[in-house]
Curated annotation (Swiss-Prot):
Protein name stated in the entry: Phosphoribosylformylglycinamidine cyclo-ligase
Family: Belongs to the AIR synthase family.
Catalytic activity: 2-formamido-N(1)-(5-O-phospho-beta-D-ribosyl)acetamidine + ATP = 5-amino-1-(5-phospho-beta-D-ribosyl)imidazole + ADP + phosphate + H(+)
One GO MF term: ATP binding
InterPro entries on file: PurM-like_C_dom, PurM-like_C_sf, PurM-like_N, PurM-like_N_sf, PurM_cligase
Keywords: ATP-binding, Cytoplasm, Ligase, Nucleotide-binding, Purine biosynthesis
UniProt pathway annotation: Purine metabolism; IMP biosynthesis via de novo pathway; 5-amino-1-(5-phospho-D-ribosyl)imidazole from N(2)-formyl-N(1)-(5-phospho-D-ribosyl)glycinamide: step 2/2
Pfam families: AIRS (PF00586), AIRS_C (PF02769)
Coiled coil, from the record: none
Swiss-Prot/TrEMBL GO biological process terms: 'de novo' IMP biosynthetic process; adenine biosynthetic process
Location within or outside the cell: Cytoplasm
Amino acid sequence: MNTTSLSYRDAGVDIDAGDALVENIKPFAKRTMRPEVLGGIGGFGALVEISKKYKEPVLVSGTDGVGTKLKLAFDWNRHDTVGIDLVAMSVNDILVQGAEPLFFLDYFACGKLDVAQATEVIKGIAAGCEQAGCALTGGETAEMPGMYPAGEYDLAGFAVGVVEKSKVISGRDIVPGDVVLGLASNGVHSNGYSLVRKIIDRAQPELDAPFDGDKTLRDAVIAPTRIYVKPLLKLMETLPVKGMAHITGGGITENTPRVLPDNTVAQIDAASWQLPKLFQWLQREGNVDIQEMYRTFNCGIGMVVVVAPEHAEQALALLREAGETVYRIGQVRERQGGEHQTQIA
C-alpha cells in the first residue's frame, strides 16, 4: 500500500495558480465597475442594484461562447481578443431588446491552468466589458485535469442588462415600408468558423502575407467581434427603433426574421454594400454559393436595425457620427405565402 501523502496539486489542480490569476485580473476588472455594483471581485456572488431611474425595470439576460474560433486561438497562440468576442456575443444579443448591459460573468475551463494565457483571455473580457459599458463582476475558473488537451480551454459568458418595460424592443411594430439598416461588421465575428477553418485547411494560404491594407490574413480572420452597445443605446435614446437583429450563427438570412412579424419580409439589396475582402476570399477559396454565404456568415453586416422611413436618414447620420459604418440595405414588405422572411437579391 502506498502511503505517500497526496495533495490537490498532485491531482492536477493548482490553487495557488488560481489565486495568482485572480490577483492578475483584479485591476482590469476594477476598470469596468459601475456605480450599481456593490462590492468587488472575490465574493461568493456579485451584488448589483437597479438604478432608481427605471420605473418598471425589466432584466434581460444572455449567454454564449466563442465557438470553434477558439481552435484558431490555440493554433495561432492568439488569446488577447477572444475575450472581446465572448463579451460581444452576449451583450449584442441583449442589446437588440433595448437593454443596457449592466454586468457580465465568465466561465473559463481548462485541463491545466496557464496563468499567463488565462490572464490574456480575461484581459480581453475586461476590454470587451469596457467597450460595452458593463461591469465584469466575477466568473469561474475551472481547472479540470484530463478534461482538455494541454494549452486548450473553453469559454462561456453571461450578460445581464436592464430596459424600461415600456421601451422593450420586440419587433412587433414593424410594418411594410419600414427601412432596414445594416451596421458593418469587423470580420467574421464569432460564427461560421468551422467552415472558415475548413477553407483555410483546403487553401493552405500564407497567413502572414499582407491581405487587406496593413492587415495580414491571420489578423483579418481572428479580428474580434464588434460591440455595438454604445452607438445603438445613443440611437435608441434619440429616436424610435422598431427592431434589431444581431447577425450571428445563421447569417443575415436566418437572424433577420427573428425580429420580424410573421406577415413581413426583409427585402435586402445585396448591392447596397460591398462584400468585404475577407468574405470574397472565403467564397472564392471555398467555392461557396452566395446564398450559403448569407446563411452562414454576417457577410459584412454585424447588426440589422429597422426604423420607420421618416427616421431612416436621421438614424444613418447619428450612427455615422458615432463612428459606425452603416448602410441602408433594404426595406420591409408584405410576405407572400410561406416565403422565407429574408430575401437577398
